[in-house]
């Protein structure tokens, strides 16, 4: 079922902090996107590109295994990963193996190990704590315990042509998109957007990055799976549509 999660804590080793407004959207079919803009960029480099990380993937790019009633493993092989796109040195390569435990509060504890210096080198452990939000609210509202969101709106659009690849996921009132230009490896080729539906049924942009943010879809009503949507010359395909 769809999910809209806010990260509360990011911990590497003994150091826990949170410098971002990180939201992760998961569609009803299991497609996913995570945008992690910085709250207070601390230097010129961060001010120029105020993003910790962003990635997106299809349901074919993740493997989920149930361990028990409260625990699953999720193995990610991201379709779009801006660290990989930017060729950032010393980053994990390949599948990322994670374990997710649901607490009594319904917060989700994600743990895992990455190997930025190579699979034969010492790994780096991490933990992220996630709070499920009510995606039908425009504010950060904690999802009530036991909330059934199986019928929430879940719409996914994809672009993958000769020049661009990207994913746009709408869960409830919240839309997030990530798109990269093929053949490049600089921040100039990265575009991302986060927006929320207002009382007038339009979408208010809360965060955006890139010169082609006007090429993201901005209307999500009455879309049928398999149809094409033209946005200022960019053709997006609806790959999921649940209302």
UniProtKB/Swiss-Prot annotation:
According to the UniProt record, one GO cellular component term is: endoplasmic reticulum membrane
Major place of residence: cytoplasm
Task: Please give the superkingdom of this protein's source.
Answer: Eukaryota
Q: Does the keyword Cytoplasm apply?
A: yes
Q: What subcellular locations does the record give?
A: Cytoplasm; Nucleus
Q: Could you provide one GO biological process annotation from this protein's UniProt record?
A: protein targeting to membrane
Which keywords annotate this record? Cytoplasm, Nucleus
Pfam families recorded for this chain?
HRI1 (PF16815)
What does the sequence similarity comment in the record state about its family? Belongs to the HRI1 family.
Q: What is this protein called?
A: Protein HRI1
User: Organism source for this protein?
Assistant: Vanderwaltozyma polyspora (strain ATCC 22028 / DSM 70294 / BCRC 21397 / CBS 2163 / NBRC 10782 / NRRL Y-8283 / UCD 57-17) (Kluyveromyces polysporus)
* Organismal lineage: Eukaryota, Fungi, Dikarya, Ascomycota, Saccharomycotina
* Gene that encodes it: HRI1
